[in-house]
Amino acid sequence: MAKSFFAAFLIIMLISSLVDGKSTVGQKLKKKLNQAVDKVKEVLNKSEYMCPVVSSFCKQHCARLGKSGQCDLLECICS
């Protein structure tokens, strides 16, 4: 999945570089791409979504809330 995401990103970057930056189509494409990148960064910065990958993220997230945390499948449970 990471390879296909990277390939799609490269294709989008290629298309955006070919489109003239002054045209409205190029500006709209760049704006949408920036919004998508910002949304991905926002999701990745939330520790509870990283719980299945690394359980320490759940513990850190719950510690910020003043609770103890445990990762249960796809859910971070703070108690």
UniProtKB/Swiss-Prot annotation:
Q: Supply the alphabetized keyword list.
A: Antibiotic, Antimicrobial, Disulfide bond, Ion channel impairing toxin, Neurotoxin, Potassium channel impairing toxin, Secreted, Signal, Toxin, Voltage-gated potassium channel impairing toxin
Q: In which tissues is it expressed?
A: Expressed by the venom gland.
- Sequence ranges assigned to domain BetaSPN-type CS-alpha/beta in this UniProt record: 48-79
Judging by the UniProt lineage, the source's domain of life is Eukaryota
Major subcellular site: secreted
Q: Give each disulfide bond as a residue pair.
A: 51-71, 58-76, 62-78
Q: Which GO terms describe its biological process?
A: defense response to bacterium
Q: Which residues form the signal peptide?
A: 1-21
Please report the name of this protein according to its UniProt entry: Potassium channel toxin Hge-beta-KTx
Any one GO CC term of this protein is: extracellular region
Q: In this record, what's one Pfam family? A: Scorpion_toxin_alpha-beta
Protein task: The full peptide presents antibacterial and cytotoxic activities. The synthetic C-terminus (AA 33-76) inhibits voltage-gated potassium channels Kv1.1/KCNA1, Kv1.2/KCNA2, and Kv1.3/KCNA3.
The residue stretches assigned to a coiled coil in this entry are none
Task: Report the family membership.
Answer: Belongs to the long chain scorpion toxin family. Class 2 subfamily.
Q: In which compartments does the protein localize?
A: Secreted
A GO MF annotation of the entry reads:
toxin activity
